[in-house]
Design a protein with these regions (language model features):
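Conserved alpha/beta-hydrolase "acid-adjacent" motif
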Residues: 207-213
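Short beta-strand/loop motif that positions the catalytic acidic residue
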Residues: 193-194, 199-202, 206
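Hydrolase active-site cap/lid region
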Residues: 121-173
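Conserved alpha/beta-hydrolase
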Residues: 49-68
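Short beta-strand element of the alpha/beta-hydrolase
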Residues: 25-35
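Alpha/beta-hydrolase active-site loop
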Residues: 71-101
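N-terminal cap/lid segment of alpha/beta-hydrolase-fold proteins
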Residues: 1-25
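Catalytic histidine-centered segment of alpha/beta-hydrolase-like enzymes
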Residues: 231-242
Length: 252
């Protein structure tokens, strides 16, 4: 695998990045949005996309892993928008200070599960051309049931602190925001969604993100949903690589 560079946006958001393996007429950027909880391991997907001619950025949300701040202090999709804010200024990698000039012509976002919500909400920004949302959380009404699938601890935030240490600096208060129905919730923005900008993938037997919630979101918004009878909680890396021709055509 290619060695990914590292940079920092807005002084807090650490991101790995790769320049495109070959230069094209346009500077195309893909930003990857991680699930949660998860370990940062999308580097093979970064390399795959860089070989396809894209700049690839893989940020850590504020309060997660290498980034500064507190997790869910603000909506994670705003961290993605902060990255987009900074891209036209050029990128300075952290190890040796090498600078990369970048003036994005097109920006795409790919997110899975928890990160699928970030991708969908990022699509509301007119700088984002298209997004891919894989097995995305589209409505946090699922949260109480989903928590019980992951842990017997009645305090999910306490479980995360115990199991992931400082991987997530997560307070009980910030986690409770997700139960409110508006914070970081695509379902609260149904009327604003541009269905032409979003493509979703989801398996009907997903044990964590109920297919019914995603199908309902697709029906209400007109977003294209690629459904699979089986597959469980689908891997974003697998989906992007296996269905790249379909995704590339959608990107336009």
């Amino acid at each position: 695998m290619s060695w990914a560079f590292r940079t920092r946006f807005k002084k807090e958001i650490v991101a790995e990045f790769l320049p495109p393996a070959r230069l094209g007429k346009k500077q195309k950027v893909i930003i990857l949005c991680d699930g949660m909880p998860s370990i940062p391991r999308k580097q093979p997907l970064m390399e795959f996309l860089a070989r396809k001619g894209y700049w690839v950025f893989y940020p850590r949300y504020r309060g997660a892993w290498e980034s500064g701040g507190k997790f869910l202090e603000r909506s994670p999709h705003k961290d993605i928008l902060d990255v987009i804010d900074e891209l036209p200024k050029g990128i300075r990698e952290l190890a040796f200070g090498k600078r990369f000039a970048l003036k994005p012509d097109e920006i795409f976002v790919i997110g899975g599960s928890f990160g699928g919500a970030a991708a969908i909400l990022a699509s509301l920004d007119n700088r984002v051309k298209k997004v891919i949302a894989n097995c995305p959380v589209v409505d946090w009404k699922i949260l109480a049931a989903e928590e019980r699938l992951e842990t017997s601890n009645p305090n999910y935030a306490a479980y995360i602190r115990a199991a992931f240490g400082n991987g997530y600096r997560l307070s009980d208060r910030n986690w409770r925001k997700l139960h409110g129905g508006r914070f970081y919730n695509p379902a609260a923005h149904v009327s604003e969604i541009d269905s032409a900008k979003i493509m979703m993938f989801h398996a009907q037997d997903d044990p964590y993100v109920p297919y019914k919630s995603v199908k309902n979101f697709a029906d209400r918004t007109g977003v294209k949903l690629n459904s699979f009878a089986r597959g469980g909680h689908l891997s974003t890396e697998m989906i992007v690589q296996k269905y790249w021709k379909r995704i590339k055509k959608f990107f336009g």
